[in-house]
């Protein structure tokens, strides 16, 4: 079976490269590597998510679920220096890169963690994710069913999914689970959703 970016320990040879994250009012240079999601450029879905979601809360606990090398976490931490940003992934190489990028950028408010390293009592004032749709529907649904209930009552999740990789069916599934889902934007085949209680 081919190795994927959601493998816990990528075996593919390392070949790090710098990629640029270009957003209105924010330019970040991030180190990426083979064996992690979108290792040669910031994924267009991630860009759509960051461009179309509102500014994050200025304080509280924020979650980047499936953080990869950290473009979402680093953007959130830069925009909300008073918040704690949890960068969570199962991929060890991704976590090393996310930690390195946060440190290099002086973002001391980023906490890089495996899923089981996040205290169970932690509740989130916002969740952002370009979720790993290629992991399969069942695993994706389990992932979201685990983390979405950890949102505080007044907070939202912001997610992006490619229309051609099940973005609309993901929104329908979330609605069927009792979540209020609003399509905030549709850009170049990517759906940006707000998910709330």
Task: Give the positions of each predicted feature.
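Class I S-adenosyl-L-methionine
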Residues: 3-15, 167-197
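Glycine-rich phosphate-binding "P-loop"
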Residues: 126-138
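Conserved beta-strand signature within the Rossmann-like core of class I S-adenosyl-L-methionine
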Residues: 154-161
């Amino acid at each position: 079976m081919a190795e994927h970016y959601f493998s816990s320990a990528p075996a593919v040879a390392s070949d790090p490269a710098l990629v640029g994250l270009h957003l209105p009012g924010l330019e970040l240079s991030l180190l990426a590597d083979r064996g992690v999601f979108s290792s040669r450029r910031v994924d267009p879905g991630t860009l759509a998510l960051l461009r179309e979601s509102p500014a994050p809360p200025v304080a509280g606990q924020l979650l980047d679920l499936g953080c990869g090398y950290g473009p979402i976490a680093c953007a959130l931490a830069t925009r909300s220096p008073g918040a704690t940003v949890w960068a969570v992934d199962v991929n060890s190489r991704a976590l090393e890169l996310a930690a390195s990028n946060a440190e290099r950028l002086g973002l001391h408010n980023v906490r890089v963690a495996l899923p089981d390293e996040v205290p169970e009592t932690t509740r989130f004032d916002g969740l952002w994710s370009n979720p790993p749709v290629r992991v399969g529907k069942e695993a994706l649904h389990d992932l979201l069913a685990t983390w979405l209930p950890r949102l505080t009552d007044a907070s939202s999740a912001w997610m992006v999914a490619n229309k051609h990789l099940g973005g609309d069916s993901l929104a329908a599934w979330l609605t069927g689970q009792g979540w209020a889902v609003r399509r905030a934007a549709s850009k170049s085949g990517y759906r940006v959703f707000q998910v709330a209680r």
